[in-house]
């Protein structure tokens, strides 16, 4: 089990997503969204997220800021994944932990495949796709990666519930420390 704890967000936490995406630089936004979103486009994207249909996952730092996020959009028979990790936190496995949690959710939804679409030059996403042994097709500067999912079972459902409970406990501990003040 990874020591990176990934927690699912509720619709009430939508406001916490906006600072995360706004903290992405111009190039990072271009790689994450496929085009260089300005601040208004980022806000519109966050406002359009359908928490009833989709799943949003986050990794929090000790100050309770989102440092990594995954949006899993449920489609007809598949789920599409977008991942972002803030620059100072890359190379630590956050993207892989977010992808693993998204994989588990998509499997438990009963979809047949997890799909990622990105620019071919997005080395981080291409690396994640290869590590997850996704089937990658690159053409005209864009890449699509697919992972066929096995059916959900008791283990996958338990794994998801357990991961969420541990992440909620970790978040509560961090929140308690923030109430106590620095150095506690």
Q: Could you say what each language-model-derived stretch is?
A:
Residues 2, 83-84, 117-118, 124-184:
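Terminal substrate-recognition subdomain of acyl/acetyltransferases
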Residues 18-21, 25:
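Hydrophobic alpha-helical core bundles mediating ligand binding, dimerization, or RNAP-core interactions
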Residues 25-30, 103:
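Short strand-loop-strand
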Residues 86-88, 92, 121:
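Active-site acidic-Proline motif in GNAT/NAT acetyltransferases
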Residues 91-106, 113, 127-131:
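Conserved acetyl-CoA-binding loop-helix of GNAT-fold acetyltransferases
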């Amino acid at each position: 089990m990874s020591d990176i704890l990934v927690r699912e967000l509720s619709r009430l936490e939508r406001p916490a997503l906006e600072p995360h995406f706004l903290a992405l630089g111009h190039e990072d936004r271009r790689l994450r969204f496929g085009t260089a979103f300005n601040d208004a486009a980022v806000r519109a994207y966050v406002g359009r997220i359908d928490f009833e249909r989709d799943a949003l996952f986050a990794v929090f730092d000790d100050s309770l800021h989102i440092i990594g996020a995954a949006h899993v959009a449920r489609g007809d028979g598949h789920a599409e994944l977008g991942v972002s990790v803030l620059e100072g936190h890359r190379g630590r496995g956050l993207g892989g932990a977010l992808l693993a949690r998204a994989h588990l959710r998509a499997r438990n939804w009963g979809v047949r495949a997890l799909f990622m679409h990105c620019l071919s030059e997005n080395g981080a996403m291409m690396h994640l796709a290869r590590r997850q042994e996704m089937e990658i097709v690159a053409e005209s500067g864009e890449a699509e990666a697919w992972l066929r999912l096995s059916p959900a079972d008791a283990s996958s459902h338990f794994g998801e519930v357990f991961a969420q409970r541990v992440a909620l406990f970790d978040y509560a501990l961090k929140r308690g420390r923030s109430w106590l003040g620095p150095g506690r």
